[in-house]
């Protein structure tokens, strides 16, 4: 494994253990050249998934890109990083086990929306504002009112 600090090719694994959800292996490594320590995560990749963007371009599924977009939606919210990790891992697992080699970007967005719906209303609205391309304050108001309506008890 290449050292992120000096670029040296070899590192030594000092500690290895499964993550909380068991979906990855966390490895503590030390560079053999500069001695820097860093952490890597090893995950099983069941299938290579290609994402079809709105413009028709195709690109490999990028877990880190999905993670960043969810983290941005959850920024400054009382949400534990481990919960975000589980949410992203769950979506990735669904994609890899779906049997499809290609998936529309809009389908991934819908999966994130569905996961965030029961997660945190503010994060849900933030993600929706990008996913649904809100352009005016009225778009936020209309979307927020659907959440409020859904949350009201039936009389």
UniProtKB/Swiss-Prot annotation:
Assigned keywords, A-Z: ATP-binding, DNA-binding, Metal-binding, Nucleotide-binding, Repressor, Transcription, Transcription regulation, Zinc, Zinc-finger
Co-factor requirement: Zn(2+)
Positions annotated as zinc finger (unnamed): 3-34
Domain ATP-cone: 49-139
Native source organism of the sequence: Sphingopyxis alaskensis (strain DSM 13593 / LMG 18877 / RB2256) (Sphingomonas alaskensis)
NCBIfam families registered for this protein in UniProt: transcriptional regulator NrdR
Cofactor note as given: Binds 1 zinc ion.
One family name in Pfam for this protein: ATP-cone
Function: Negatively regulates transcription of bacterial ribonucleotide reductase nrd genes and operons by binding to NrdR-boxes.
A single BP term in Gene Ontology: negative regulation of DNA-templated transcription
Protein name (record): Transcriptional repressor NrdR
């Amino acid at each position: 494994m290449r050292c992120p600090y000096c670029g040296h090719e070899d590192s030594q694994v000092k500690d290895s253990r499964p993550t909380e959800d068991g979906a990855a292996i966390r490895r503590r490594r030390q560079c053999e050249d500069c001695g820097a320590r860093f952490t890597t995560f090893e995950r099983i990749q069941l299938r290579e998934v290609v994402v079809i963007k709105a413009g028709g371009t195709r690109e490999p599924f990028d877990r880190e890109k999905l993670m960043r977009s969810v983290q941005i939606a959850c920024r400054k919210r009382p949400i534990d990083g481990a919960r975000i990790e589980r949410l992203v891992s769950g979506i990735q697992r669904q994609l890899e086990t779906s049997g499809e080699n290609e998936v529309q970007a809009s389908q991934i967005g819908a999966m994130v929306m569905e996961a965030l719906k029961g997660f945190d209303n503010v994060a849900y609205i933030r993600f929706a504002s990008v996913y649904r391309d809100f352009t005016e304050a009225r778009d936020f108001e209309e979307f927020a009112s659907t959440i409020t309506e859904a949350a009201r008890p039936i009389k």
